Design a protein with these regions (language model features):
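Intrinsically disordered, low-complexity linker/loop segments enriched in Gly/Pro
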Residues: 99-158, 164
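A contiguous pocket-lining binding segment that forms or flanks enzyme active sites
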Residues: 162, 168-170
Length: 170
């Protein structure tokens, strides 16, 4: 938040104008999370592998593991804050290459908390957008745990899915 927006928000909330009071008041304001995660799965040495990862912010992924054998890479998507609040924007992009097989899940429920009502301190919208692209004969099993939406949330939870004619999505 730039200084002018902070000053406006502080004065609107408290009516105060002292710089000492402003500094202490803004310690309590939360900055928004702008997070992104890109995962790419491909066949490498006859094994479905997580071959590329790119991340920004608190989104992460646990190392792939293989409880069903080398044909299916299992990964946990991790979001340590464990919930989405006003102003947060989470973008997840997953690409499954031809013949690769991935199972994607989460260790816990996703949560959209009550949105802020004072828009002077930021947008109320809470957004999670997932783009999944499955190419060739790729297989994507997407099993996130439940999503809990609290009363007063201003949430967008969007899934955009692109499948080739021979791909599978569960």
């Amino acid at each position: 938040m730039d200084d002018m927006k902070q000053e406006f928000a502080y004065e609107k909330l408290s009516g105060a104008s002292s710089s000492v009071n402003k500094a202490s008041a803004f310690k309590g304001l939360k900055n928004k999370w702008l997070a992104s995660l890109f995962l790419e799965f491909a066949i490498k040495s006859n094994v479905s592998q997580l071959v590329k990862t790119s991340r920004r912010g608190p989104l992460n992924v646990q190392k792939a593991f293989y409880p069903e054998g080398k044909d299916c890479a299992h990964v946990y998507l991790l979001h340590p804050p464990a919930g989405i609040v006003s102003g947060d924007e989470l973008n997840i992009e997953i690409c499954i290459q031809d013949s690769a097989h991935a199972l994607i899940t989460t260790p816990g429920a996703n949560r959209f908390y009550r949105a802020r009502t004072n828009l002077a301190i930021g947008d109320s919208k809470q957004t999670q957008i997932s783009n999944i692209n499955v190419l060739g004969k790729g297989i994507c099993e997407n099993f996130p745990l439940e999503t809990i939406v609290y009363e007063g949330a201003d949430a967008i939870n969007q899934l955009d899915l692109k499948l080739s004619s021979q791909a599978h999505y569960i």
